Amino acid sequence: MSGNGFGHLFRFTTFGESHGPAIGCVVDGVPARIPLTEADIQHYLDQRKPGQNRFTTQRREPDEVKILSGVFEGLTTGTSIGLLIENTDQRSKDYGEIKDTYRPGHADWVYQQKYGIRDYRGGGRSSARETAMRVAAGAIARKVLDALAPGLSIRGAMVQMGPHAIDRSRWDWAELGNNPFWCPDGAAAKSWEEYLDTIRKSGSSIGGVVEVVASGVPVGLGAPVYDKLDADLAKAMMSINAVKGVEIGDGFAAAALSGEENADEMRMGNDGQVGFLSNHAGGILGGISTGQDVVVRLAVKPTSSILTPKQSVDAKGNNVEVSTKGRHDPCVAIRAVPVAEAMMACTLADHLLRSLAQPRLS
């Protein structure tokens, strides 16, 4: 199985399965002498880890990361950074009844068809458990960005749960820590609690929309034609489990705009720098960053692991009904927020290093 790595100069490769002994990753391309500790990585892992409230899976994994290589006396050495997280709360028996049955909406059947073998315990390699290592890699990417692009910040939020979207006029980043949804609209978050409680108690699930904003991005990241920044961001976000759609800036809404409405007009500022009067493009033009906020939204489907019986087939070709047991998120979009932030960080770090490797000559 190929396709376990992401990036070019800043590159990470993940390994491990949901119910295996551990998950891990190897991060390459990190410059030497960048301060890095396990606590730096743990800070972001704690934002993603399961079992923190009733709205996420009750699988309780501490997600304690160990740095195995590439760091000496608190500084990166420039060599590969090896990271490991041990799995401690697997319940493989929850999946015994479906080991020969394909769960609708999951990767079970296609894995079996492609490889002739699959780890049925929690989805194996296709499990969102893998995303913990993306968050770990993203924490390192943030340290690279801190060193090479001071002032660059990345923040993510959940802006829609099912059909219920936030009121953008009430957007307040300070609200993110006041609710379990990473929601910037406090009033919306309160209504979501009751809504998701109903979904959760019924054994069902619901999707959502996540928005990630990177501020302070330098001008000039990305390159035509096939190395566009937005193309790589789309790939990064689409690679996250359960993501079924990605848009940059106004995205699909731009299709309904006129040319006059959509174009981000430009003016010279009092500081002598070029400024924009709007940001419909989401901070990227021609695949190259403009210096404005880079804005990405992703649509996250509802998890297919629900109690409601669904029609499927088994390995012997019989028609069956499947009701998925185990511990699952009623809305996976919640924990997708720190994962999306991490993929934004990894993509920007990679493009920043690539840009520095090909400087413009005076």
Swiss-Prot record:
Catalytic activity entry: 5-O-(1-carboxyvinyl)-3-phosphoshikimate = chorismate + phosphate
Co-factor(s): FMNH2
Origin: domain of life: Bacteria
Pathway(s) this gene product operates in, as recorded in its UniProt entry: Metabolic intermediate biosynthesis; chorismate biosynthesis; chorismate from D-erythrose 4-phosphate and phosphoenolpyruvate: step 7/7
EC number of the protein: 4.2.3.5
Entry binding sites for FMN: 125-127, 241-242, 286, 301-305, 327
Keyword set includes GTP-binding: no
Binding residue positions for NADP(+): 48, 54
One GO term of the biological process aspect: amino acid biosynthetic process
Oligomeric form and interacting partners: Homotetramer.
Family membership: Belongs to the chorismate synthase family.
Protein name: Chorismate synthase
Organism: Paramagnetospirillum magneticum (strain ATCC 700264 / AMB-1)
UniProt lineage: Bacteria, Pseudomonadati, Pseudomonadota, Alphaproteobacteria, Rhodospirillales
Gene, per the UniProt record: aroC
